[in-house]
Structures are given as structure tokens and as C-alpha cells.
Regions:
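Active-site microenvironment for binding and transforming phosphate-containing groups
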Residues: 2-298
Length: 298
């Protein structure tokens, strides 16, 4: 158990937050607090020069109630001015400009968009001119890709050789469609990336212990993954339900796309197990804000 002291809304009202890591003996993400904002980073990515990345937490924003306090969604009923201030605070803490963010339009597809200079600010300073985009890739310095979460799986990709990046949102539908592999293939096509040189990461999301699904979902995983992987991905229960491991599924997808095992970072941090620290759709029964994954090129 990891304890941090947090000023939830930067009002001098400090509280102790317990972070439950999934496997205490495994490598963890770094917990960073700057300017009152707490966010997460990967040690492996921190060693790659020329890139910026982060995964937000609930701590350090100005939103209230069920959105407390670092909500990054404009569409869940929070005040727009609070959400904009949250973006500003997070960007300042991590070290990029809010105006450089490009956001996804997540609808559980496997669509991956090539992001260019013209996209700068989409979803933040101007409306998005696209829909149905769950993944993005770019090689434009200064742009920061952003995708959003409250249990689904963030997938990060960095190609330090060609200075290119990818960031994708993978719920169970995106995992069945292997959006992680689609993202890598698009990076190969657009930038000449070699998968063996790409560093990948699976982000904080719902763990297998918390993720119960029905037979119809498992049928799609059986169709998408070879039988020798099934035992690692899910197990059945007497009531006919299953516990599904989206972390392992996306890890296998990254390996299948050609990434090296030693280049893949895992989160060991479950959104549903940490409802005070991270937003979780399941833990909150849908009454929540959104977390954000961010990845950019300096």
C-alpha cells in the first residue's frame, strides 16, 4: 500500500490517499506531485529524451462533487470553466501547453488518426473536425495527444528512433479489434517505425479481479485470441460470468505487433481498486469524471 498526502482541491484541506498497487513486488509507475497536481509517469518513458507523457489522477483540480477534482471531460455535466482550469493546471504541472493538446473522439472503434499541425488544439481550443477516433499517431514536435478513461485501457507507444508516437483507447471492444496492433501498423506505414524499436505501455485501468463480463464478451475474445492464450486472459465462474484481464490481452497484442517484452511497461494500478485516486465507471456506478492519458514530442 502506497500512501500520499493530497490537497484534493488545493484549498488547504489535506487528506491521506491510499494507493493500492496490483502487485506490490512489481515495477510501478512514478507518482509525481507538482504545483499541487498529482499525475503518473512510467520510469522507462522518463528515460527516453525528447518526449513528454503523463496519466492524470483525481487530485489537484477544481471540479467538485462527483467530478472532484481533476475531471477532464467536457461532456459529463461538469462546468466548462472548471474543466478548462483543470487542463491548464495539469499542463503546467507536466510541462506542456494546454493549447497544444489534440483530443480523441472515443466511440470504441479501432480507428487511428494521423495527427498533423492543423489538428493543434482540437477538442480544447476549437471543435474537433472528426468523429470516431480512438487512436492517434503523430511525428509533429510540440503536439500532445490526449485520450480519456475511467476503466478502459490507455495504450502508449513511443518510437525514439523516428521520433514518433501513438496513443490509443482500448476498451474490451477495442481490445478485440486489437487497436494496439492497428496503432503500431499505422506508425510503420506513416513513419517507417520498426516495432522492435517501439516502447509501449499499458495504462491504469480496470484489473481482472474487478472486471466481470458475460459470455457474449468472452465469445469475442475466443474468436480474437488463440486458444493457448485463453487461460491467461479469462476464467469462468459458477454463475456463468467471467473475469477478464484486459492488461494481459493488450500486452499480448503488443507482443504480437512486434514490440519487445523488455520494451513494454505495465501499470499494476487498477482504476476500480482506487476510487479516491482515480475515476472508475464501475466503482462509481457511472457517476464520475474522466482521467486523461497524454503523450507528446518535445
Amino acid at each position: 500500500m502506497h500512501l500520499i498526502t493530497a490537497d484534493k482541491m488545493q484549498r488547504g484541506e489535506y487528506t491521506m490517499i491510499k494507493i493500492k498497487w496490483h502487485q506490490e513486488n512489481e515495477p510501478r509507475m512514478h507518482v509525481n506531485t507538482r504545483e499541487g497536481v498529482t499525475y503518473l509517469t512510467y520510469p522507462e518513458f522518463d528515460r527516453l529524451p525528447g518526449f513528454v507523457h503523463a496519466f492524470s489522477t483525481r487530485l489537484g483540480g477544481v471540479s467538485e462533487g462527483i467530478y472532484s477534482s481533476m475531471n477532464l471531460s467536457f461532456t459529463r455535466g461538469d462546468k466548462d470553466e472548471a474543466v478548462r482550469e483543470n487542463y491548464r493546471r495539469l499542463a503546467d504541472a507536466v510541462g506542456f501547453k494546454m493549447e497544444d493538446i489534440v483530443t480523441s473522439d472515443q466511440t470504441h472503434t479501432a480507428n487511428v488518426r494521423l495527427v498533423t499541425e492543423e489538428d493543434r488544439g482540437n477538442g480544447i481550443t476549437k471543435p474537433r473536425p472528426y468523429t470516431d477516433v480512438d487512436g492517434m499517431i503523430t511525428n509533429v514536435p510540440g503536439l500532445v495527444l490526449a485520450t480519456f478513461y475511467a476503466d478502459c485501457v490507455p495504450l502508449y507507444f513511443i518510437d525514439p528512433v523516428h521520433r514518433a508516437i501513438g496513443l490509443s483507447h482500448s476498451g474490451w471492444r477495442g481490445t478485440v479489434a486489437k487497436i494496439g496492433e492497428v496503432t503500431v501498423r499505422r506508425m510503420q506505414e506513416e513513419f517507417g517505425s520498426d516495432p522492435s524499436e517501439i516502447y509501449g505501455a499499458v495504462g491504469p485501468s480496470i484489473c481482472q479481479d474487478c472486471y466481470e463480463v458475460s459470455e457474449d464478451v468472452i465469445e469475442q475474445f475466443r474468436a480474437a485470441f488463440p486458444q493457448d492464450k485463453w487461460d491467461a486472459l479469462f476464467y469462468g465462474k459458477p454463475d456463468g460470468k467471467y473475469q477478464l484481464d484486459l492488461w494481459e490481452a493488450n500486452y499480448q497484442i503488443m507482443l504480437g505487433a512486434g514490440l519487445k517484452e523488455e520494451h513494454i511497461s505495465m501499470p499494476n494500478l487498477c482504476t476500480c481498486c482506487n476510487p479516491e485516486f482515480l475515476f472508475s465507471h464501475r466503482a462509481s456506478h457511472g457517476r464520475r469524471g474522466n482521467l486523461g492519458a497524454f503523450l507528446g514530442i518535445r
